[in-house]
Amino acid sequence: MGKVIGIDLGTTNSAMAVYEGNEAKIIANKEGKNTTPSIVAFTDKGEILVGESAKRQAVTNPEKTIYSIKRIMGLMFNEDKAKEAEKRLPYKIVDRNGACAIEISGKVYTPQEISAKILMKLKEDAESYLGESVTEAVITVPAYFNDSQRKATKEAGTIAGLNVLRIINEPTSAALAYGLDKKESEKIMVYDLGGGTFDVTVLETGDNVVEVLATGGDAFLGGDDFDNRVIDFLASEFKSETGIEIKNDVMALQRLKEAAENAKKELSSAMETEINLPFITADATGPKHLVKKLTRAKFESLTEDLMEETISKIESVIKDAGLTKNEISEVVMVGGSTRIPKVQERVKAFINKELNKSVNPDEVVAVGASIQGGVLKGDVKDVLLLDVTPLSLGIETLGGVMTKVIDRGTTIPAKKSQVFSTAEDNQPAVSIMVLQGERELARDNKSLGKFDLQGIAPAPRGVPQIEVTFDIDANGILTVSAQDKNTGKSQEIKISGSSGLSDSEIEKMVKDAELHKEEDARKKEVIEARNHADSLAHQTQKSLDEHKTNLNENDANEIQNAINALKDCIKNDNATKAELEDKTKALAQAAQKLGEAMANKNNAEQPKKKDDDVIDAEVE
């Protein structure tokens, strides 16, 4: 096994590191820099440029210069985030089999292919630095990347000629780099605000163990969004002065983007900067120039809501970890956007302690990835990394209920099985709807995928045993399988494509779960009462039909009337839990005479003992 490199494949910049000689070292690229712009350009001469060379020619070649490709990695074309990206990015985003892709000079490229070109550049530079072939890597992703985004990242590595040993979360990687030498137990928070994504993770480190307690974030919140606020401001000011909508000109838009990014960086050390873009456009009256002063205060007012969004996520993640702010020992700042003074100020004010700036925000994630590479290779001993799944996973069961199989915050890798059954007599197949979220009802959660298990042997409802297994690997990629324990027939699905969750949906699910907790609980109680009533009505009707001759006519009619009354109540969508329970109780009392008659005739069936494994829920 050769050297394993750790790669931080960023939205704006990428970095790489290697673990050798008992320490992690950043690998400089061929240009001598520790970070490489995540930019790919296609020239008119057919040349493909990556990194600094691609960035330098972006203004003159905006439609063929691809940046922020990570923002559409694993996205479906019809998703709102894809439409937002399409408005912001100068290159053409197209639909390829339902997924986002880009078109350059009539040729379609997937985000994986573009990302692979960046990874190839990193791989070649690492080989030049190390003097040997590199074939294996650990690549980092935002903590809230969904399954399809993680899968796409792994595919990009494969295209680049890398065997991706592990996909790990960026803040977890940063914590690994920070906490490797910590002997005393500490609860740390990693605040990771990069070019395109935001993650916040609370971890416990100490004695060579890094354990994630809770994680949250937004895969569509980062430095790009801060830049876009400046772009919108400059374009609006220019339009009010000249009447020209400058954002319709892709070359002018690229110049605006670069100016906005530079202004943001300058305002990290200066209180005011001037944006000067001569000959930005022209109209019938002649050329137009854009000259505008931007103060730090104005920049902060333009981006205040973005900063506050990160603070609200910090609050929820600390709560999810079961901690208070006072229990956080250290706050580690990661990502280039954490250099913004107001970001530091707001985080410090919220946590009420000094921020730890001992790590290089651009390099620490790659360093952590290289340490994980060292762990996998065996060079780093006795280090345990425990990451978690961000949301609960389960399936839809009878009545539209979400039955959880793996709870949010479960340490990965994880594998868990539950046994379900059928909802109808002689049901030949079951449909397994895989869900992700925190709500009680299936329709309020995210559908990840659906598959059918066919060929179930004819049997009364509730008799077949369908074992459903959820298996999340160390990369956070999910596989779900179902097996008929009687026939041995099985089916599985690897969640991918349109099944992924957008981060805004995840955040909305968590918030909705809190807002609707009591309402959801009430609805679930009604559904459970209805399911119990339906089961009793079905079983009693079956027994009555078989043993009616053992009853006098009045008793038989009384039981049948109670069954009919309960069935009418079940059919009433507005029936309350109390009404269902009353009718169920009435039938149970009436059915006692049936039980007595059956016992007297010695025809009673011994109730079948339930398997301890079987969950009292049915699959439609």
Curated annotation (Swiss-Prot):
Q: Which residue stretches belong to region Disordered?
A: 591-620
Which GO terms label this protein's molecular function in UniProt? ATP binding; ATP-dependent protein folding chaperone; unfolded protein binding
Which is a Pfam family this sequence falls into?
HSP70
Disulfide bond residue pairs: none
Upregulating conditions? By stress conditions e.g. heat shock.
Carrying Phosphothreonine, the residues are: 197
- Per the record, the coiled-coil ranges are none
User: Which SUPFAM superfamilies would you find in this protein's record?
Assistant: Actin-like ATPase domain, Heat shock protein 70kD (HSP70), C-terminal subdomain, Heat shock protein 70kD (HSP70), peptide-binding domain
Q: Which UniProt keywords apply?
A: ATP-binding, Chaperone, Nucleotide-binding, Phosphoprotein, Stress response
CDD domains on file: ASKHA_NBD_HSP70_DnaK-like
Q: Which NCBIfam families match?
A: PRK00290.1, PRK05183.1, prok_dnaK
Task: Provide the function of this protein.
Answer: Acts as a chaperone.
Family the entry assigns: Belongs to the heat shock protein 70 family.
Name of the protein in question = Chaperone protein DnaK
- Organism field: Helicobacter pylori (strain HPAG1)
